[in-house]
Every structure is written in structure tokens, then in C-alpha cells.
Amino acid sequence: MAKVKICGLKDPDMVAFAAREGADWVGFVFAPSVRQVTLAAAETLLLSVGKATPVALMVDPSDAEAQAVAALGFPILQLHGQETPARAAELKSLTGCAIWKAIGVQTRDNLGQIGTFPDIDGLLLDAKPPEGATIAGGHGAAFDWSILKGWTAPKPWLLAGGLTPENVAEAIAATGAPGVDVSSGVERIRGLKDRELVRAFIRAAKASEQP
């Protein structure tokens, strides 16, 4: 049974629904995107997280931006930009938050950079954004899961990129992912989560068997 993160939420009712359905984490985007939320909106959304743990997705945040988000009570910052290992460590010290780093995967070589981030608390392996993309994630593209064959994760990690209710069980079986992250894969209209898809994704992931 894998853990589940539903990312890109911006409606309090949907946040509460995802938490009730069993999402372990609920993610809020603080970067340019159709799913972006403001600090004020996030403060309201946090009231609906229930037992789920909130995660703040940020892209190359300044000190002030990271501190403002952390001050809302987020325990985890997910860095989705070009943050260096030193910058990740700085943000961890500055905010007191756990730090997850998103790593774009296209080839096996991309996994090599993970070892350069000793101070992070978790990893999110996502498909590398398409060339010319203006946002870091939520593209609905998957990477070749066979790249992870024989790989041993040095940190807790989540699989992301192109996951849907239809393929998440296969993805978990193929990679052994202990957790999965979804955004566009549970949307029928871009930027708007669909209850049926959210429920189906969580149930499929929770019912899956890891190798």
C-alpha cells in the first residue's frame, strides 16, 4: 500500500474531500501555475486538511517567500526549481521545515544528482519538464519507470509524473514507490480536481502491491 499526495489543490471542499478519502499529503502550489494559491488562500485551505499533512510546493523561493509560507504552519517545503544542495540546506535551516526536493528524471544519469543533496528529508522523482515549459510540474508526462530498476533510494521518496487512477497501481508495482504524487492526473478540466478521479486514484494506490 503506497502513500498518496494530491497536489495542486486550491478549493477548501476538495482539500477536505481528499483528506477524508485517505490522502496522506495535500499539496499547495506557491509558484506561477493554473494551480497557484496566495498566502491568504493557503491560510484558509489549511483549515480543511484534516489528518492529511500539508506540503508547500515552491520554485526557487527567496528567503522572505519561504519564511512567509513556513509561518502559515507548513511542515514540509517541496522545492521544484533549480535549488542547489546548499540552498536546500539554507532553506531547511531558515524555515525549520522538512525539505523535499523534486528531481527531474529522463535518464538513469539524472539519479546521480540525488546524492549531492545530503540535507534534504525526501525526494520526489518527476518527469523532466518538456522543453520550453514555463512551469515545473503538473504536465501529465511520465518517465520510463524501468530507469529505477535496481535503484536504492537514499531518502524517503515519491513517484510523480503522468500518474492516473488507471496506471498508478502499475507504476507502484514497477518501481516499488512507497508514495505517489498526482496533480493533473486527477483533473478533467485543467487546474480543477475531480472528486471521482481523486477517489479512484487514492483507492488504486492504497490497494496496490509493492514488489
Curated annotation (Swiss-Prot):
Its EC number is 5.3.1.24. InterPro entries: Aldolase_TIM (IPR013785), PRAI_dom (IPR001240), RibuloseP-bd_barrel (IPR011060), TrpF_fam (IPR044643). Coiled coil: none annotated. It catalyses: N-(5-phospho-beta-D-ribosyl)anthranilate = 1-(2-carboxyphenylamino)-1-deoxy-D-ribulose 5-phosphate. GO terms for molecular function: phosphoribosylanthranilate isomerase activity. Keywords: Amino-acid biosynthesis, Aromatic amino acid biosynthesis, Isomerase, Tryptophan biosynthesis. One of its GO terms (biological process) is L-tryptophan biosynthetic process. The keyword Isomerase applies. Pathway: Amino-acid biosynthesis; L-tryptophan biosynthesis; L-tryptophan from chorismate: step 3/5. PANTHER family: N-(5'-PHOSPHORIBOSYL)ANTHRANILATE ISOMERASE. HAMAP family: PRAI. Belongs to the TrpF family. This is N-(5'-phosphoribosyl)anthranilate isomerase. It comes from Hyphomonas neptunium (strain ATCC 15444).
